[in-house]
Amino acid sequence: MEVEIRLGSVRYPFRLGTDCLGAIVEDLVAMSASRLLIVCDSNTGPLFGAELVERLSPRVPANLLIHRAGEPYKDLQAVGTLADSALQLGADRASVVVAVGGGVIGNIAGLMAALLFRGIRLVHIPTSLIAMSDSVLSLKQAVNACVGKNLMGTFYAPESVLADTAMLRSLPFRETVSGLCEVVKNSLAIRPSMVEMLRTSLRQDAVYDDETMYEIISESILAKASVTVDDMHECRAGLVLEYGHTVGHAIEYTAAGGLSHGQAIGLGMVVAAEVSHRLGHLDQEAVALHRELLTRAGAMVTIPEEVDLDEVMHRLRFDNKRGYLADPAESSAMVLLGGLGEPLWHDGRPLVSVPMALVGEVVNEIARPEIPNFELVAPVETVEEGRVPDTVGAADG
């Protein structure tokens, strides 16, 4: 499958297949790069990066650059360290940065490509579900600041995305669920026609065959493309992709690696749905659907007690959507839904100014829920986050 990703005036191909590493190698060789800089983390390097370099090296200069895995290490220091290594290896303007990993490596390598020589070519080889179905469908390349997530970065387009669903077979439970939470987001906020497919396909054990993964990724591509085609900087219609991210980012940052990105966003969606319901916009059936789909995906819908709720509320003040609305001092700009696939708009953007007191009230209740969690009619065994059912491997989400 090949689709053209359209983000405003930007176009690039997304090639999706299964067991297609040979084709990926041919695509990379065809770029006639002076050097291929294969950027991985400490998980994806041994799993995929080493084999890529081995296959490429007889035909084109290729080097493996490995960074420590994990969201806590997504910062400017990582970008600088990897860029210095690339330059010492002989990188020049004709080199290509190849990001092999999940969302973290994609952002680090993407920002590195944008900065080296003021911009060299970039290719994404996503190895996680969250990357294949979400992060590579964007021009955003960003790293974290000391006060919050994704506060330093730029917009930079890849030459192409080359994806092999076979790479998802090594994905741990935690990272599969992480990606599925973003897929659920796309269905609830953008493409409700996906809901019945997800109800049928989602599994609490997070074990999927290649065909199901292919369908899930394909549907997510269509969902995301529909709101970014005329909004390459994701500052108007594309802001709907931030659904669940206001509180979700704050939870993720506070958890300091204890929760995956997608799991935190899932919790952020539960908060956003309940906030919208209390403001009189979203009906209870739609709120319950949030919990149902997340539960079916194997995600938690209660904020863990280890997460410091006061710190979560503090981190909301550093959300990367600040400034889009003329927010009162004690409020937060959030993407809220008035119905499935129906974000609420204000001043030309799908954002609503919400009192911080209401957000805090809902956050506290979801951490110590009086609202019952959704229970499947025919429950199956739930695998705890972090447990790897069969295979060990990873991408970084």
Swiss-Prot record:
CDD domains the record matches: DOIS
Residues the record lists as binding NAD(+): 41, 71-74, 103-107, 127-128, 138-140, 149-150
Catalytic center residues: K140, E242
Necessary cofactors: NAD(+); Co(2+)
Keywords: Antibiotic biosynthesis, Cobalt, Lyase, Metal-binding, NAD
Keyword Metal-binding belongs to the record: yes
UniProt binding sites for Co(2+): E182, H245, H261
BP-aspect Gene Ontology terms: antibiotic biosynthetic process; aromatic amino acid family biosynthetic process
EC number: 4.2.3.124
UniProt enzyme class: lyase
Cofactor note: Binds 1 Co(2+) ion per subunit.
Domain of life: Bacteria
A molecular function (GO) term: 3-dehydroquinate synthase activity
Catalytic activity: D-glucose 6-phosphate = 2-deoxy-L-scyllo-inosose + phosphate
One Pfam assignment: DHQS_C
Statement: the UniProt record of this protein carries the keyword Transport: no
Metabolic or biological pathway, per its Swiss-Prot or TrEMBL entry: Metabolic intermediate biosynthesis; 2-deoxystreptamine biosynthesis; 2-deoxystreptamine from D-glucose 6-phosphate: step 1/4; Antibiotic biosynthesis; gentamicin biosynthesis
Thermal properties: Optimum temperature is 42 degrees Celsius.
Family: Belongs to the sugar phosphate cyclases superfamily. DOI synthase family.
Function description: Catalyzes the intramolecular carbocycle formation from D-glucose-6-phosphate to 2-deoxy-scyllo-inosose (DOI).
Protein name: 2-deoxy-scyllo-inosose synthase
Organism: Micromonospora echinospora
